[in-house]
Amino acid sequence: MPRALSIKFDNTYMDLYDELPESKLLYDEEFSYLLDAVRQNGVCVVDFLTLTPKELARLIQRSINEVFRFQQLLVHEYNEKYLEICEKNSISPDNGPECFTTADVAMDELLGGGIFTHGITEIFGESSTGKSQLLMQLALSVQLSEPAGGLGGKCVYITTEGDLPTQRLESMLSSRPAYEKLGITQSNIFTVSCNDLINQEHIINVQLPILLERSKGSIKLVIIDSISHHLRVELQNKSFRESQENKNYLDRMAEKLQILAHDYSLSVVVANQVGDKPLANSPVAHRTYVTDYDYQLGWLVGWKNSTILYRQMNSLLGASSNNDEILSDDEDYMLIERVMSTVNDRNYDFFSKKKPPIIENKTVERNSSSPISRQSKKRKFDYRVPNLGLTWSNHVSTRILLQKSFKASTIIQRGEAHLYKGGDSASFWQVKRTMKVVYSTFAKPGQIAYQITKRGIETA
């Protein structure tokens, strides 16, 4: 019986049987001597798929016609295997994605119906934007019956930054009396905490699949809060090799979550933290192309169009160029400045002594002696990006951005600042929260204002 064709890999041998166990070439008497020559000369399967018959014949000292016949049969078997793997399977409506409500009608409309199964939904944003609030709200709303907008399912809540805040969940339940009548309780939420990356990996790859298998379809939502907490701390990225290994790790993790979402018809919703994307300070101009990641980044992370154009022009013309006019003015900041300058008995420099609360976006200030420059001093551009990069983004079906910024308070907008008797200008600002669908398989990009209440996340 002829020997199996071997692949040389990292100083070991892996035979053709491992690659194509059903291959008829393994035991074809016609190629027995060729297989012996292949083994003796250390020629691998990849060589047969990439080299010409002439080059192969020289390597193994066999006739070019014999090599050509073997090569053609091997390629044919690989093509058949590829077509078998890529065969399309029709999906019946019963097995397609379903959605459940967020417990807010306006949010559901923004998301194209709600949170969908068979995929990964990412919620990202800075701290105190309400990511965990929304996740806990989903852990309750998924328990609603299908006529009420839910899936009648249970939830698995995986935390990486501490224990699940059960008191906040209880507060949400008590503020929604109808939930108690519908049988929605914390007992339908399985919770587990992981304190390091190894523990997180074990939960996703071992414990979670076992729990889902035993639940027999009763679990409809898996929440991870947050997905990047341990990854960004423990994954080293000091070399190109480590960078590639990290990408492979993220791919495997995301694919595992997608497989679970598909096999068990459930939703995977994760929170993601953010990092900074500084503005390039290179004085040398360089052209960016549509295919460049930096060119596409703004649309993948929810930046404003003015920020995207500003960064592109900064790269094209260099950091020394003045592109401030591209950015939008902070109208609320300028409004408060004008109001403060007219308030009697408030004779202090607003910009030097009184700063507004921390603003979400970085600003650009223009140095000019023109009277108009004082009105155009504050310019905003986006610089926050979700962690884990493009590798992770490619696996996300819906990306939701939660933003927290500040706007002029009602007393300023109504022109009633003169009625305010205090001395703290921070009272002239109020929180502005925005939910933005960056991209989604099920909905168009859009945004809506929201607020955090006792009931959870509600549209303003």
UniProtKB/Swiss-Prot annotation:
SMART domains: AAA. The keyword Plastid does not apply. Pfam families: Rad51. It comes from the Eukaryota. GO terms for biological process: DNA recombinase assembly; DNA strand invasion; double-strand break repair; error-free postreplication DNA repair; heteroduplex formation; meiotic DNA recombinase assembly; mitotic recombination; positive regulation of single-strand break repair via homologous recombination. It is found in: Nucleus. ATP binds at residues 125-132. InterPro entries: AAA+_ATPase, DNA_recomb/repair_Rad51_C, P-loop_NTPase, RecA_ATP-bd, XRCC3-like_C. GO terms for cellular component: Rad51C-XRCC3 complex. Participates in the repair of X-ray-induced damage to DNA and in meiosis. It may act in part by stabilizing a repair complex of other RAD genes. PANTHER family: RE19845P (PTHR22942:SF66), RECA/RAD51/RADA DNA STRAND-PAIRING FAMILY MEMBER (PTHR22942). This is DNA repair protein RAD57. It comes from Saccharomyces cerevisiae (strain ATCC 204508 / S288c). The gene is RAD57.
